[in-house]
UniProtKB/Swiss-Prot annotation:
GO molecular function: intramolecular oxidoreductase activity, interconverting aldoses and ketoses; L-ribulose-5-phosphate 3-epimerase activity
Family: Belongs to the L-ribulose-5-phosphate 3-epimerase family.
Pathway of action: Cofactor degradation; L-ascorbate degradation; D-xylulose 5-phosphate from L-ascorbate: step 3/4
Pfam family, one: AP_endonuc_2
Function: Catalyzes the isomerization of L-xylulose-5-phosphate to L-ribulose-5-phosphate. Is involved in the anaerobic L-ascorbate utilization.
Name assigned to this protein: L-ribulose-5-phosphate 3-epimerase UlaE
First-level EC class: isomerase
Source domain of life: Bacteria
Catalytic reactions on record: L-ribulose 5-phosphate = L-xylulose 5-phosphate
TM ranges: none
Induction: Induced by L-ascorbate. Repressed by UlaR.
Enzyme Commission number(s) of this protein: 5.1.3.22
Organism the protein comes from: Escherichia coli O8 (strain IAI1)
Amino acid sequence: MLSKQIPLGIYEKALPAGECWLERLQLAKMLGFDFVEMSVDETDDRLSRLDWSREQRLALVNAIVETGVRVPSMCLSAHRRFPLGSEDDAVRAQGLEIMRKAIQFAQDVGIRVIQLAGYDVYYQEANNETRRRFRDGLKESVEMASRAQVTLAMEIMDYPLMNSISKALGYAHYLNNPWFQLYPDIGNLSAWDNDVQMELQAGIGHIVAVHVKDTKPGVFKNVPFGEGVVDFERCFETLKQSGYCGPYLIEMWSETAEDPAAEVAKARDWVKARMAKAGMVEAA
């Protein structure tokens, strides 16, 4: 049985696609998860959630209450399309407006943590000016988040600007704000030439959640668990020994699979077995 001190969640994109959150949370509960992480990506469909009516927001809150499965975090990857570091003022303004709406949405439905994508720009060429604009955009975003009491947490990315906890800590020190923290992805962290254990230890005190996935160098998505380079047992041991007691989120993109629930159940069992070996949970 999963320890109550270690919440285990599943990414929305691992579960069947659709807009019925009651069904999604019921399935997550059946699969043994404590929470689901919402995705607001660069697609128009998921971006439109930020414009939900009061009734739509209330339906999500009611689904959470009915199922007991929380939605405590949002993966906000929409800034790939509307980056805060864009040299196009109109695009950057859209990025800041998305941030404002996301923070308001989080405040309305009880989301505590918004995971940020650490891209100054994604589809354009980066330079000193895009990085400066990105820093300024983060500063403005954290000011908004502070007023709303919503935490912004930087993901460790598949992108050189933010591919280590050490680099993300630089932004945390620059912003010097308790509402800006870190949300490492042990898959992304392992795919680069990082000393993963040292990086995880360096982040303790700033880590608010952890993404769990497997990766290979240069391959950051859809690597089956056990086929990549991540030393899960060592990562879990390091986090446990360092005093981290927060949530873990299995990140998968199986929403279009033939049987998403079966894929998720298989991954859940695999991850929990590694957690048990690390002394984090009881063996199944």
